[in-house]
């Protein structure tokens, strides 16, 4: 019996109406699936949803294969716990199965401190392999032909970055007693008086990494080799250094003393920085004792001892000895070679070549100027000569000066960022990840050095100018780029036009016109002719990009916490370790880049994929961006800045106290515990302090 429908069969409708009904039905189905089951649709039909290869060509299978049928499409993990606390995600888990398998057996070869490349596969790393360069191991940092089947080194860096972070978090002290034990194991002495009050403050404010304060003691250690009377003299002399201010803490109160009229009346940043440091003290000032701390008003460090003297002081301090020989002529110079060991690559004149297939594994080690001689020719602060007319004036004598940034060689004492009480700036409107551009973004002023024909004559080699020239190259130059081979885990070197790379991967420019330049000698005019300056952008502009670059200015980059707080992957290049660099996990919460930028296009190729749409790792990048946000939320709060400064002031109060060496400024919990610990670690009061002549 035929079925009688209350309406005409679509098959009996005119052909145009059939197409209309078909299109409407398909649209309704797509809309339904888009709302309730988006993973069943190919990414090309869901452009507003995240995709692990968003920049792939429309002819790429990944654009047409629904995620539910695509084994390479990673799942989306939870980003917050039930209390709204951000969760750290696993970038490594977002790799394909083939990439994970390769990464687990990958060996990374360190070619210089903090810099690695993938080790050649054993089966192919032989003389029988025509693609293997057996002279590679004898070269310092040179480019070579890639062995066939080589694993991409970034896979191993993702593996190691995650393991480093997980291990660090797991190993943190949970009790005051554990924290004391960790301190004594690291430094061979008891913590400072008031350590228990600091611990209670840290725990009450949920400080995530209470054991990671090594930069404090590393910077203070040389001062322990100075006799108390000598250190007292240095404190007085430090207050006479121009362009500084001193905080005088006594009986739970703080007094601000300006050490010159310029600092008080002229320099715009002086008052906000001093006030910010004072405001940070408020919750703990009653616990930090009595001391006088002198701060520079500048961003850059000023103390640079000769290597021999620095080692003498460190050796004496580590052995609990005192040096009475001053042996420190205060020369108004900044001689980096004298600050490095005689057998260092810098003093041996070793050449460090660009290498697109090597990457930073340990950023702290990679910042070592002595081990990376190329820095002397590609960073503004190292290119520029310093003398008695410089600001700040350089010193080769160990003065206790607190500073917002320093290199690993400088003798200054690092403090936390000090703008707006050290708080992160408001990041503004931050679009969803999939609505951001896949290019790398950077805008900045032409800072880094004074541009002139004298001390700043090499300004074209400075770090900011080089970045601009690299991204906006208009020549026919080719460069090598290490590219992923799909999602196989393999890598290949390819020569590509620098101009095309810049156009595809970069939105990077110097902005605001010439800056810090000499009009009298014609340098400003040269800058205007050679640099296509962009207009200044708002700080929110960087939020429109998945990848943002951060590099040094005259010193450290104050924009770093704001960039990390937004939903971007921060790619950072610097020679300045900061107060919390030890706790910043590479390739997990951010991506480090070498100072010569030779790895920059290789990094972008790994994450965004090749211009033809191959090998993108968008979900890996998204998770790194979220980890960066979470890292800032968990470790760069106002309370974290206070915890650091609280601990620094406790250490500083002991260091500068007349009772430094008699044990009265050490922490002991109870008389019973003090007696027990005295059997293992003698207090300074129980031993005669040896004196050595150095």
UniProtKB/Swiss-Prot annotation:
Its EC number is 2.4.1.-. The chain crosses the membrane at residues 19-39. SMART domains: CAP10 (SM00672). It is found in: Membrane. It comes from the Eukaryota. GO terms for molecular function: UDP-xylosyltransferase activity. Disruption phenotype: Attenuation of cryptococcal growth in a mouse model of infection due to defects in capsule polysaccharide content. The general morphology of the capsule is normal but two main capsule polysaccharides, glucuronoxylomannan (GXM) and galactoxylomannan (GalXM), lack beta-1,2-xylose residues. Residues 661-694 are annotated as: Disordered. Glycans are attached at residue 141. It is a single-pass type II membrane protein. Beta-1,2-xylosyltransferase that plays a key role in capsule polysaccharide synthesis by transferring xylose to alpha-1,3-dimannoside in a beta-1,2-linkage. Also mediates glycosylation of glycosphingolipids; constitutes the unique xylosyltransferase responsible for adding xylose to glycosphingolipids. Belongs to the glycosyltransferase 90 family. This is Beta-1,2-xylosyltransferase 1. The gene is CXT1.
């Amino acid at each position: 019996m035929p079925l009688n429908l209350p309406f005409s069969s679509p098959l009996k409708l005119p052909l145009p109406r059939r197409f209309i009904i078909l299109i409407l039905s398909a649209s309704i189905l797509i809309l339904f699936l888009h709302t309730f089951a988006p993973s069943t649709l190919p990414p090309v039909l869901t452009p507003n949803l995240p995709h692990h290869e968003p920049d792939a060509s429309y002819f790429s299978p990944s654009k047409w294969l629904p995620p539910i049928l695509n084994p390479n499409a990673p799942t989306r993990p939870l980003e917050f716990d039930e209390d709204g606390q951000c969760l750290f995600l696993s970038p490594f888990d977002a790799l394909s199965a083939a990439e994970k398998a390769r990464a687990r057996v990958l060996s990374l070869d360190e070619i210089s401190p903090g810099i690695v490349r993938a080790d050649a596969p054993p089966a192919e790393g032989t003389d029988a392999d025509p693609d293997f360069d057996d002279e590679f191991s004898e070269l310092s940092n040179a480019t070579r032909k890639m062995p066939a089947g080589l694993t991409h080194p970034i896979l191993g860096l993702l593996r190691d970055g995650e393991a480093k972070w997980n291990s660090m978090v797991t190993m943190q002290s949970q009790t005051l007693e554990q924290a004391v034990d960790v301190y004594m194991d690291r430094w061979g002495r008891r913590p400072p008086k008031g350590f228990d009050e600091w611990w209670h403050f840290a725990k009450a404010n949920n400080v995530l990494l209470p054991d990671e304060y090594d930069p404090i003691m590393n910077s203070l250690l040389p001062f322990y080799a100075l006799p108390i009377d000598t250190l007292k003299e240095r404190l007085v002399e430090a207050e006479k250094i121009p362009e500084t201010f001193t905080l005088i803490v006594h009986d739970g109160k703080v007094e601000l003393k300006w050490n010159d009229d310029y600092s008080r009346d002229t320099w715009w940043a002086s008052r906000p920085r001093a006030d910010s440091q004072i405001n940070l003290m408020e919750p703990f000032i009653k616990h930090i004792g009595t001391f006088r701390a002198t701060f520079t008003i500048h961003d850059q460090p000023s103390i640079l001892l000769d290597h021999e003297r620095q080692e003498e002081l460190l050796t004496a301090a580590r052995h609990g000895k005192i040096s009475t020989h001053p042996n420190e002529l205060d020369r108004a110079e900044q001689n980096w070679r004298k600050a490095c060991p005689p057998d260092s690559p810098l003093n041996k004149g070793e050449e460090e070549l660009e290498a697109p297939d090597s990457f930073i594994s340990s950023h702290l080690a990679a910042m070592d100027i002595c081990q990376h001689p190329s820095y002397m020719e590609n960073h503004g602060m190292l290119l520029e000569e310093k003398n008695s007319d410089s600001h700040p004036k350089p010193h080769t004598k160990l003065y206790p000066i607190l500073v917002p940034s320093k290199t690993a060689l400088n003798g200054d004492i690092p403090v936390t960022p000090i703008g707006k009480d050290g708080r992160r700036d408001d990041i503004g409107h931050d679009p969803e990840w999939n609505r951001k551009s896949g290019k790398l973004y950077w805008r900045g002023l032409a800072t880094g050095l004074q541009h002139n024909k004298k001390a700043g004559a090499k300004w074209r080699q400075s770090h900011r100018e080089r970045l601009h020239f690299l991204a906006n190259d208009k020549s026919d130059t080719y460069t090598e780029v290490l590219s992923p081979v799909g999602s196989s885990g393999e890598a290949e070197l390819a020569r590509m036009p620098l101009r095309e790379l810049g156009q595809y991967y970069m939105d990077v420019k110097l902005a605001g016109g010439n800056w810090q330049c000499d009009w009298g000698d014609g340098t400003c005019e040269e800058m205007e002719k050679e640099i296509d300056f962009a207009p200044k952008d708002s700080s929110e502009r960087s939020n429109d990009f998945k990848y943002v670059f951060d590099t040094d200015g005259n010193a450290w980059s104050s924009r770093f916490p704001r960039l990390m707080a937004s939903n971007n992957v921060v790619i950072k290049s610097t020679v300045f370790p900061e107060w919390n660099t030890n706790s910043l996990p590479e390739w997990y919460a951010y991506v480090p880049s070498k100072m010569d930028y030779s790895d920059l296009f290789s990094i972008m190729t790994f994450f965004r994929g090749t211009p033809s749409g191959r090998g993108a790792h968008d979900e890996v990048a998204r998770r790194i961006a979220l980890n960066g946000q979470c890292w800032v939320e968990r470790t760069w709060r106002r309370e974290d800045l206070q915890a650091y400064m609280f601990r620094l002031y406790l250490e500083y109060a002991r260091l500068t106290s007349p009772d430094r060496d008699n044990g009265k400024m050490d922490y002991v919990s109870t008389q019973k515990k003090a007696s027990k610990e005295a059997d293992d670690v003698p207090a300074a009061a129980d031993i005669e302090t040896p004196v050595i002549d150095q």
